A protein has these predicted regions:
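Active-site neighborhoods and metal-handling regions in enzymes and metal-associated proteins
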Residues: 1-121
């Protein structure tokens, strides 16, 4: 069984041009969504509101299937890399963390970015 698993792993490690096309498309959509979200941010918005906007934006951009639930964290919540978005509001001076990704033809993007809102504390 271990030999079969190793062979499958090796075959999957090399991507065809078509597979690379799907991965690149997923990443480009993810980058587009994040640029859109950054422009829409405002003081007082909650992590949950932003996470929901991310989901809607992926659908709008042709990728309704997410790679995983979006992670949006503000302030002290950014210390938890697997934070689940909640009603925490964005405040001036907060650190913001996004971990988002989508799926295109079963190939996923996964992007994590950190920003500061206003002047960092």
């Amino acid at each position: 069984m271990a030999v079969k698993n190793k062979l499958i792993h090796e075959v999957r490690a090399v991507k065809s041009k078509k597979e690379l096309k799907y991965i690149i498309k997923a990443q480009r959509i993810t980058e587009t969504v994040l640029r859109y979200i950054i422009v829409k941010l405002k003081t007082g918005v909650t992590e949950l509101e932003v996470a929901n906007l991310i989901k809607k934006s992926f659908t709008k951009h042709g990728a309704p299937i997410l790679a995983f639930p979006p992670i949006v964290a503000f302030g002290k919540n950014t210390a938890n890399i697997h934070h689940e978005p909640n009603k925490t509001k964005l405040r001036n001076g907060d650190t913001i963390m996004f971990d988002i990704g989508c799926t295109v033809n079963h190939y996923c993007s996964d992007m994590t970015r950190t920003y500061f809102w206003g002047k960092p504390n």
